[in-house]
Amino acid sequence: MRLLWKFLAVVLVVSFFANGQESAGKVSKFDDAEYLHLTGADKKTATPIRGTLGFNNETKIVEFVDKKNVPAFSIKYDAIKSILYERTSTPRYVAALLVSPFFLFSHSKKHYLTIQYTDDAGTGQFVSIHLDKKNARDVVATAEAATGKKVEREEEK
């Protein structure tokens, strides 16, 4: 019995130190995100690119990689000016027409993260990412912790 307790104590100590080392150089990745790439001046012409949003604490870069592992953008933490989290809410008209009028009382919610930054030339730029509802809170918390910037929150009800 004592051997079992000693073994468990050693496993706990080793896992504690191993977790501490992983968090120092950790890359936080969030799947099921969509980068809304603007192709023109009109916001309606944005093409969604599905991929993974990542916060790399070693290189201090926010990056988005599409499904084919091609980087769509990478932003240095120092270049970030502000981060905005938005949650929008819209009625479900189609479901109300097709299924039941009671769907008018429920709303679909979408989550967006907008990062405003300056590029190498010093001009202001921004990127907008549509987040998955399952990990939107984790993305906001990670963005705040990794970059050191306060994330502004704007939520529609």
Predicted segments with their positions:
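N-terminal secretory signal peptides that target proteins for export/translocation
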Residues: 1-3
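Bacterial N-terminal signal peptides
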Residues: 6-15
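Anionic N-terminal interaction surfaces
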Residues: 19-59
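Acidic, Ser/Thr- and proline-rich intrinsically disordered linker/docking segments
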Residues: 21-28, 79-157
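Short polybasic amphipathic segments
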Residues: 34-36, 60-64, 113-117
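Short acidic, glycine-rich loop/turn motifs
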Residues: 42-43, 66-68, 117-121
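Generic structural detector for well-ordered beta-strands
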Residues: 54, 74-76, 128-130
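Mid-length scaffold segments of soluble, non-membrane domains
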Residues: 58-89
